[in-house]
Structures are given as structure tokens and as C-alpha cells.
Amino acid sequence: MLNYLATQDESKCCGCGACVEICPQKALPMKPNKEGFQYPALDANRCVDCKLCEKVCPEMNPPQKAEPLDIYALQSKNAEELFESSSGGAFRLVADSVIQQGGAVVGCVWNEKMEPVLTIADSLDGLRPMQGSKYLSSSTEHTYSQTKKLLDAGRMVLFTGTPCQCAGLLNFLRKPYDNLLTMDFLCHGVPSQMAFDAYREHCEKQRNGKMSQYKCRDKSAHGWAISESYCVNGKKYTAHGMTSPYLFGFISGYFNRYSCYTCKFRGLERFTDYTISDFWGYQQKLHNHDGISAFQVNTQKGKEFMTRFEQNARYHIAKREDVAVENPAILHSHEENVPELRKTIYQQIQTDGWAVVEKKYLRCRHFYLKKLWYALPDHVTIKLRKLKH
């Protein structure tokens, strides 16, 4: 099979960066395309045709997958960590245990330019910025090679990332490590940095200041729901997912990288030790609205390690069908057509600006009614929902 470097077919590159790090000649720098997605750019003068880039490419050589051993509805008992988590705090449960045993954790944080990047933490304090979803493409930086050094030195490492980033790491390592744990999540695709920056700059222009402390998921706004928040000039602004133009575009699949639409790594079968996601709908069974994770244990190694943190969690055995009610990607590989608006939106962001694109394409049905609804206090909306039923 021909890869992206041979075809320049953007759907054949997931942007994991494994080829960049494995190249002994440094002949594959990552460069953004017009839409802001990073792709390897071959320097033919440096290339010695060693084919290592092809060997580690997860698009060409996806890791072998297997069905999960167990699926749980899981929630951390630590109220503070639960509040800061997007759903049930599954990441912190595993990560805390790894750190407490002298290990290191690879996770995604915002840098000073408001770009998501993978970094390595070896303290509990370093885990806090890794919590919470970041709904755009992240850079792996040099974390594959740094992870390998830690593993070779005998340190335990928890590597967390998108499914394709985890696949890139496993291919980069080229052998199994007993001291490695991997955790991915049910991924809905990744927007580009350019799309997010256009939205951020639009918000900054509206608010006359610089954005900081952006959160894709903020429980202080509407509890466990998809609600964004950010600060400008010390003032906090919030929006429910369907009234945020950026999150509406993300949920609708308008911003995704082309490889996301034919992702090889979706579905119930996985190659990581753990897979986490929101367990939407399960809160009715538990009468708990603080956030619940669907926690999928995929390997025997993951099952054995769970005994080290299970006492810090509330959990129940669940069925895959329970998760699939609101997360159909857990059962299906979910190949889908590229939305017709996708190319138009990216083109018009560049030519007309975010404000035009937002007004034309990024407003949900009944936009103003939804804005009014989510402006109401929680106790009012709860009473209105009860009246409806």
C-alpha cells in the first residue's frame, strides 16, 4: 500500500508524527497545509531510503486489535479530580497510581500559544493540566523517543493520546514493554489548529482582549455536559456545546482531518490497555450527574493494574450496548462520508474570516432559543424538564 509520502493523499496520514521521530536523517519535518493540519514534508536530499518511516506508519501498519476484556461505568471518589475531569475521572485514577509508583505519564496540555501538545509529567501536580478534553489536533513533540528512554531505563510509563498517537508510539517502539501502559479514548476526530485559532481570534476581537484558560469541557457551567469556557480580561465566558460555534462544528464533524473520516482505529476492538469515554445515559441508572466514564479494559496487563486503583473508584460492570447508545463508534468502525460543508468551511475561514463562517454554517437549529435555555439557572431547567415529562 502506498503511503502519504508517495501519494500526497491527505486521507492516508493521521499526523501521529511517528515517521518524523524515527527518521535517522531528520528528513521529515512536519509542516502545516492550508487548513492548518500538520503533514510530514520529505527532504529528498537527506533521505537515504531506509523505509523506517513506512514501517512505523500506523496507517500502513496498524497494530493488531483485540476485543476488550471488561467494560465498566466508573467514577472517581476524589471530588476535586472528578470536577476537573471531562467525565468520570478515569485518566486521573490510572495516572495517579502510575505516578505514586515512581512512573511517568504522557498526556496533552495547552502550551503558552494555546496549542495542545503532548508532554511528560512525573508528579501529581503535573497531571492537572492534562485533565480535560482538548478538541483539536495535538503535537506529539518528541514524546515517542522520550517515552522509549524512560522505558529502557526501567520506569513505568502511562502513555495517553488519540488512538492514532497510541498506534504511532507502539510502532515507534517496535517491541513490547512490560512497564508500558497505553490509554486512548473514543475519538470523534480532530480539528486543525488553524480552525481553533480563527475562533479564538474572533472571540478576542469581540471581547477586546487575549483569551486564556480555554476549556472544551467545563463542569462549572452546566455540570457534566459539553460546555466550553474561557477568560478574557479576567472575565469568564461560557457556552453550551450546541451554542458554541466551535463546538457545534466539532460535534457536526465539519473540522476533522481527512484521515478521521476513514479512521482505522475506531470500533470496539482496541490495541491499547485502556479506552475511556463519556458514559452518556448511565447517569440515569446511578442517579449521578457529576460525570461517569466508560472504562474499557482491553488487556490482561490493564486488568491486573486496575487492582492498584480500583479502591479509589466507584464502578459497575457494563455492557458494550450500554456505551453504544450514545457512543456508536464503540461498535462500528464508522466510516463516513466527508461532510459537504467541510471543504467550504475551511476555504471560507481563510478567505472571509470566522465571523462569516459562523453566521452561515455554525449555528444549530433554534440557536437563540437554546442560548436562552442555557442562560437559565440549573434549578429552573430541572423543574422545566420535570414538567415536560
Give short role names for the model-derived ranges.
Residues 101-104, 204, 208-389:
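Long, compositionally biased charged/polar accessory segments in the mid-to-C-terminal portions
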Residues 1-2, 45-153, 323-341, 347-357:
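Flanking helices and flexible, charged tails adjoining ferredoxin-like Fe-S electron-transfer domains
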Residues 2-5, 18-41, 51-68, 273-274:
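Iron-sulfur cluster-binding cysteine motifs and their immediate structural context
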Residues 1-10, 41-45, 242-251:
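Short, intrinsically disordered, charge-biased short linear motifs at domain edges
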Residues 181-202, 327:
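Short, flexible loop segments at boundaries between secondary-structure elements
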Residues 86-89, 112, 159-169, 189-191:
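Gly/Ser/Thr-rich loops at beta-strand to alpha-helix junctions
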Residues 170-181, 200-205:
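Short, surface-exposed basic-aromatic patches at helix termini and helix-loop junctions that form
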Residues 11-26, 48-60, 162-168, 255-268:
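Local cysteine-cluster metal-coordination motifs and their immediate loop/turn environment
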